[in-house]
Every structure is written in C-alpha cells, then in structure tokens.
Amino acid sequence: MNKLGDTLKQLLVLCVMLWIGVLETQAEEFRIRVMSYNIYRGGTMHGQPLSQTAKVIREAKADIVGLQEPRSPKGFNTERLAKILGWNHSANIRKGIVLTPHEIVANFAGGIKVKLPSGQHAYVFSLHLPSNPYQPYQLLGIRPKWHKHWDTPFIKTEVEAIEAARKARGGEVSGLLNQIRDLPDKEAAVFVVGDFNEPSHLDWTEEAAVAGRHPMKVEYPHSKAMSKAGFADAYRTVYPDEMKHPGYTWSPMYKTDDPSTHHDRIDFVYFQGRSVKLIGARVIGENEENADVVVSPYPSDHRAVVAEFMLSKPTPRTEK
C-alpha cells in the first residue's frame, strides 16, 4: 500500500510539473494576426458605412492592422475607424497608419512599437507606395479610365520594368529599410505591411509568364529588396506555388477577364525576427473564389491579407 501511495504521489508531482511547464510555455508565447488593408478612399467610397470596413478587420480576426488610403472625400477616417473598433491608432492619421487594441509605446515615421499582453514588443510599419507608373499597366499597354496619368509611357522589357519600379518606389523602400536597420532592439519582431503598388518577383516567374498569367518574367526590385534585408513574404511562404495560389489582392472591382486591368498580388505582410514563427496566411475579400475569408458586400478595391504568427521570447545568443 505504501508503494502504491508513493507511486501515486510521484505521478501527481509529475502531472503538476508538466502542467506548470505548459503554463510557462504559454506565458512565453503570444499569437498575433497582422493585416495589411487598403480600405479605398476612407472605406466609404462604395457607399457602405465605415462599420463595414471594421467588419472586414473583425472577420479577419486581426489585432494589428496596417492601413492605407484612410482619406475619404469628407476627411481622414483613421480616428473614426479606431473608435468603431475600440482600438488605438498611430499618431500619424494620414500615412504609415497602424491600428491595434494593444498598447502603442512609441511612434515612428511610418510605424509604431507595440507592447503585447505577453510583455513582448514588436515593430510594425505600414507602407503605401506610389501607384504611378504601374509596371503591369506599362507592360500591357493599359490606361484605365480612372487613371490620371495619361502621359505614362508604355514599356516592353523586364529591364525597363525594373528601372521604372526603382525610380518610382526605391527611395521610400530604402529609407524604411535603413530606419529598420537602425532600430535599437535587434531581437524584436518586425513587420512591414502595405500596398506596395508593385508585384512580387515570386509571382512574376518564368512559369507564370509561359502560362500566360503575366506578360513576362520580371524580377521586381522591392520584393527582392525586402528578401535581401531578411524579411519573408508571409503569404508566399505559406503558399510557395504561385500558380496554384496566386493570392490576388488587386482587384475585386474587376472581372478576371477584364482587359482594362491586370489582376495581381500587390498587398503584403512581411516579417522578420528570430522569435517569430509563421502559422498561416489568408486573403480577405468578396467571394469564395478569390478569398479565404468572405465579407459581403466588400467595401474596398483591394483584398486584404492577414498572417498569423506565434511570438516566443527570444533565447539569448551564445558566443562561440
């Protein structure tokens, strides 16, 4: 009987120790969903209330959102949207906007430093890069009716596309990457989200060109710049096959075969950090054919993308 009692005590102690270990692991990890969302002219241009834009964010179950195009014809809707959600927003309500229910402990040009409930910190930057000249339209000879730049030249080669993209967006991307390199906390998670107004070299591949999806292979410079700087593209990491999972975010306003546009993936969630583990990524949009999460009616001309991550407290580096 004593041996049985001792065995039961040992099992009880073991169970308690295992339970404590589980609790400690949970305390050292935190799950977040980071979203990039161009809300299209303040979120109300389709005649829908701003609450529908808030619904998109809620349905995505995001808790950090990089926002683009907050300005409506009546003014900037950043503060209104944050109020509907009951969230905090970055100090700049016009550009580099980030919304989150978590505590914002610092504001930067184009982003924030956020404190998570786990005590961990993360940096989040939101980009909205210039849309003109837009290389897919230049290569395909497209001038949409709504386009203001009727003098934009058409181009024919990959070299021309790369050069035009660098000229249009290179300064902003380089500036942001320099800013990130100067961050004091080298161990913290860093997220860069936004409407890049430029496709990815991971999508405009030789295979995609041969299949007729895109007019040619293009090594777009700024997706490559993000990769060179140590960032990973969340959606394309989860879905590496660009042919099976195009992940188009531009644009739900057009039919697939509409010759006045070209469907593409130009909205991204990039991530970096030893403590960051990617769990999944989804597109939010207007129907099941084009999105993983459906919100109808859909209030924007861009589909949103949200990625889920597990953040763990980084282990100290050991010197060799």
Question: Model-predicted segments: where are they?
Answer:
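Active-site neighborhood of phospho(di)ester-bond hydrolases with catalytic His/Asp-centered motifs
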Residues: 65-68, 91-92, 99, 191-195, ...
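A solvent-exposed, charged loop/short amphipathic helix patch at secondary-structure junctions
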Residues: 137-164, 207
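Sec-dependent N-terminal signal peptides
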Residues: 11-19
